[in-house]
């Protein structure tokens, strides 16, 4: 009996220390974001909280779709909620049943939340649990990863925030046009009285979140890009973590318990960071190799090449 009490006490102290460390890490991240982003941090926090609340509300739906996942699709729930509410807002505006305003965006979100609550109550009566019960630590670390990646890319974007180069000015112009418009498609900024005759889905969702959060395109233009980049880190982490966890089922003891999270981090780094390695290879590595071989260090580098076909690059003169 005394041994059980002693073990319970030790376990309680360990959990207490873990929670304190997690709290300190959360405070450090929030404080660090305030220091790095200065006045822009309020918009950053707003989008992060908005994604979190929407994702939480969508868990009755996401939890069923990802029922085999330990986290029940926690990170994916954020994107799913934005996609569903954004699409239905666009649909209602496109068929002229509603105006593209903040009020409409909020109304659609509230209807979505009510539907999710009703679904949650229905699932509860049937004994279906859609929340990641017993995996609080995993959810905490996924939120840390998402927040840290979002913060990192937002901070980097601040060094070159101008809407300059390739299609950036067009993207910014489309967003401003949709912010002013109450109909969709919005009036094209290039053609007087004409409508945007170009795919504008990405810009639309950026404006949807901008109107929903009552902010301005001047702040959210870059924020949307970094928001997507954060998902590009957190989603691969969640997916590969679960894949490795399932593959090693029954073997996750001792040091092997670190394998799934390390595999998840490797996936996030591979997509979010290594996926942007085109610049390093073609701008620095290949010219350096050419120089070592006695040739001219001429890379002919143009950064949009990363979005084009990579076939037959070995035949490039």
Question: How should these model regions be labeled?
Answer:
Residues 2-137:
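Membrane-embedded, hydrophobic transmembrane alpha-helices
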Residues 41, 45, 49, 137-144, ...:
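Active-site lumenal/periplasmic loops and adjacent helix-entry segments of GT-C-fold
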Residues 1-17, 126, 248-258, 310-317:
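Polar low-complexity intrinsically disordered regions
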């Amino acid at each position: 009996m005394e041994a059980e009490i002693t073990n319970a006490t030790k376990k309680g102290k360990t959990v207490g220390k873990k929670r304190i460390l997690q709290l300190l890490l959360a405070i450090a991240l929030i404080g660090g974001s305030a220091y790095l982003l200065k006045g822009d941090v309020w918009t950053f926090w707003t989008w992060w909280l908005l994604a979190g609340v929407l994702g939480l509300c969508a868990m009755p739906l996401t939890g069923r779709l990802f029922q085999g996942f330990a986290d029940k699709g926690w990170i994916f729930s954020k994107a799913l909620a934005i996609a569903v509410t954004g699409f239905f807002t666009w649909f209602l505006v496109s068929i002229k049943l509603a105006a593209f305003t903040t009020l409409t965006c909020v109304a659609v979100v509230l209807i979505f939340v009510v539907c999710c609550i009703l679904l949650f109550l229905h699932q509860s009566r049937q004994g279906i649990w859609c929340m990641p019960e017993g995996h609080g630590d995993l959810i905490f670390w996924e939120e840390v990863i998402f927040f840290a990646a979002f913060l990192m890319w937002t901070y980097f974007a601040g060094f070159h925030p101008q809407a300059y180069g390739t299609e950036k000015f067009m993207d910014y112009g489309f967003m401003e046009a949709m912010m002013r418009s109450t109909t969709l498609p919005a009036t094209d900024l290039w053609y007087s009285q004409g409508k945007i005759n170009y795919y504008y889905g990405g810009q639309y969702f950026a404006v949807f979140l901008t109107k929903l959060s009552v902010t301005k395109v001047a702040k959210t233009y870059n924020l949307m890009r970094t928001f997507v980049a954060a998902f590009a880190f957190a989603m691969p982490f969640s997916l590969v973590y679960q894949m490795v966890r399932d593959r090693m089922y029954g073997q996750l003891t001792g040091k092997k318990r670190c394998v799934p999270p390390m595999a998840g981090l490797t996936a996030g780094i591979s997509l979010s960071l290594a996926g942007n390695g085109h610049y390093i290879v073609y701008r620095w590595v290949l010219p350096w190799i050419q120089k070592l071989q006695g040739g001219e260090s001429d890379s002919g580098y143009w950064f949009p090449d990363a979005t084009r076909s990579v076939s037959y690059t070995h035949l490039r003169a």
